Design a protein with these regions (language model features):
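Beta-propeller fold detector
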Residues: 1-9, 53-61, 106-115, 157-170
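Beta-strand-rich domains and repeat architectures in extracellular enzymes and scaffolds
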Residues: 4-38
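Repeated scaffold domains used in trafficking and secretory/extracellular systems
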Residues: 13-20, 62-76, 112-130, 167-186, ...
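Entry beta-strands of beta-propeller and related beta-repeat scaffolds
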Residues: 25-29, 79-83, 132-138, 186-197
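Short glycine/acidic-enriched loop and turn motifs that connect beta-strands
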Residues: 33-38, 87-92, 142-146
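Beta-propeller blade signature
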Residues: 40-51, 93-104, 149-152
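Blade-loop segments of beta-propeller domains
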Residues: 41-85
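Loop-centered beta-sheet repeat module
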Residues: 126, 133-150
Length: 197
């Protein structure tokens, strides 16, 4: 951050601001007003050059959901910005992917994914284009070796898959709040583990 723009602060030790992504010349940081399912959600938009807070974009009320809303902000392969919730039990409280209109903060739900077992999902990754309805949602399951994939075609869930990785580094599982990073359509990673689709 350049001198004079030291305005990036995170209250409550960052528990209200758990995700960020860069698109173009800007960095977007997810935010919620409190740690509750009814919290209001927002994105802080920062200049990628100076670190200056450009805008606090309030998001639509559709963001409010269990367990905590607006836990992360992510982008797809075409730089469409989406937010996701934190779910402690994806079998009863699905993880939702909401596409953000960066002009007015309105939200469009593009995916709602669930699991057959009680899995916690903190973060997901996207590959594809949510604007066309053709994309894939990836998640590494907390404290496990499981990776889940939900494939959407023309806006509808067409397939879901689970894979177990052989090993993880540096522990025996992915850990507390793992993130998946899609490298290309055939390779993704969570920390030090590289997985082939």
């Amino acid at each position: 951050i350049r001198e004079g723009y030291k305005n990036i602060t995170f209250g409550e030790n960052g528990s209200f601001n758990r995700g960020m992504c860069a698109v173009g010349d800007y960095v977007y940081v997810s935010g919620r007003s409190e740690n509750s399912s009814g919290a209001s959600a927002y994105l802080n938009k920062y200049s990628g050059v100076t670190g200056e807070l450009v805008e606090k974009l309030m998001l639509g009320s559709e963001a409010a959901m269990a367990y905590y809303p607006c836990n992360d902000v992510i982008k797809d392969s075409k730089d469409n910005i989406c937010i996701t919730n934190l779910t402690l039990d994806a079998s009863s409280n699905p993880l939702a992917v909401l596409w953000v209109n960066l002009e007015d903060g309105s939200l469009t739900k593009v995916a709602s994914v669930s699991t057959t077992s009680k899995y916690r999902i903190d973060h997901v990754a996207l590959w594809g284009d949510v604007s066309t309805g053709n994309f894939t949602v990836y998640a590494a399951i907390r404290e496990s070796k499981l990776v889940m994939r939900w494939i959407y075609e023309n806006g509808k869930l067409s397939k879901s898959e689970t894979c177990t990785v052989k090993s993880t580094y540096s522990g025996s599982t992915f850990g507390m709040a793992p993130r998946m990073i899609v490298i290309d359509e055939d390779l993704l990673t969570s920390g030090k583990v590289e997985l082939s689709k």
